[in-house]
Amino acid sequence: MAYESIPLTEEIHIDKLYTVHYFEYRSDFYYAGERHNFWEFQCVDKGSAKVQTDDDVYVLNRGQVIFHQPNEFHNLTAVGQTAPNIAVVSFECCSPCMDFFKKRILTLSDTERNLIGMIIAEAVSY
């Protein structure tokens, strides 16, 4: 029996991880902001947070994630009475299809949220 292979294409290749964190912030938390030459995403696991970028201000709720492209200013402020829990992952990626994520807020499914949880759990084990 002859086997036929299927070539795989790698659309997104993450070259380096810089941070993988899970923060449990206070309800009055404020971070003045930063900019750096790599990608970052912030995913709200509980509560709500306001994120200011170079161009806009967004309010993210549970299950939403925002991507920050390299050199984009971003800060973070807790919103509401519930202290927010936020996963922050920063990484280097030069794949052209990352353009899709620029200035993008996505609402994650439970499966996607669980995958981020597994990334956090693995990072904590190191």
Language model: regions and residue ranges:
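Generic protein-terminus/edge-of-domain signal
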Residues: 1-59, 72, 80, 116, ...
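Residues at the C-termini of beta-strands that transition into short coil/loop
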Residues: 24, 90-92, 109
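Short, glycine/charged-enriched secondary-structure capping and boundary segments
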Residues: 57, 82-83, 102-104
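Conserved beta-strand positions that form and line the central face of beta-propeller blades
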Residues: 59, 75, 105
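Loop/turn positions that initiate beta-strands
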Residues: 63-64
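DNA-recognition element of transcription regulators
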Residues: 67
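Ligand-binding loop in jelly-roll beta-barrel domains
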Residues: 71-99
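Amphipathic alpha-helical segments enriched in hydrophobic/aromatic residues interleaved with Lys/Arg
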Residues: 98-126
